[in-house]
Amino acid sequence: ARSHQADVTGRLVDALKQIDGAYSLVCVADDMLIGVRDPHGVRPLILGKRDDTWLLASESCALDIVGATVVRDLEPGEMLIIDKNGVRSEMPFQQVAPRFCVFEYVYFSRPDSIVEGRGVYHARKAIGGELASESHIDADLIIPVPDSGVPAALGYAEKSGVPFDLGIIRNHYVGRTFIQPTQKGRTDSVKLKHNANPAAVKGKRIVLVDDSIVRGTT
């Protein structure tokens, strides 16, 4: 099907109205930079500025790295058009219920990012503290599954008063294991990626904290 809209932004809106799902889209067309966040706001999209230059990124830490300032999050269903005249905002989609993905706070976003106005690192520590309040058992040490389980484990340790230690050592030269196509591949990669630290864990009662359990491989 071909859109009958006269301009690029109109055609883009026509195309996106056919999609019911999660996206944060950034594209360059003619002399414009266009950013669109899906109507449910499942994924974040952030506007930043460095001097006279406008930027769009999926995480605030990307703006920090290039010396830009975070201006604001795009609203669910918002389209930003950036051109030589500046920035203009449009809300071209029908308003629907927000469905922000909680996994941004749990796993997807970097700990040094701010998502929807809240720091990811502190959100993860708070989740760990809440877990300690709800489900604490007697233990000698709180151990994280590195690296993404570290903030939650710190929060758990602070809330419970049980010492935190590094009982699992991560090999940072092994790539992503979660996205391996087969279970055998994921299992083999985890064996290379993580190793128990006997000096820390031998003879100890351990509470092991991870950010989430999807397949249970780690």
What function would you assign to each model-found segment?
Residues 1-76, 81-139, 145:
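Conserved short alpha-helical segments that host acidic/polar catalytic motifs at enzyme active sites
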Residues 29, 202, 210:
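A cytosolic small-molecule/anion-sensing beta-strand core signal
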Residues 3, 119-121, 184-187, 212:
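Short, flexible loop segments at the rims of nucleotide/cofactor-binding pockets, characterized by
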Residues 22-23, 42, 76-77, 165, ...:
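Active-site lining segments that contact anionic ligands and/or coordinate catalytic metals
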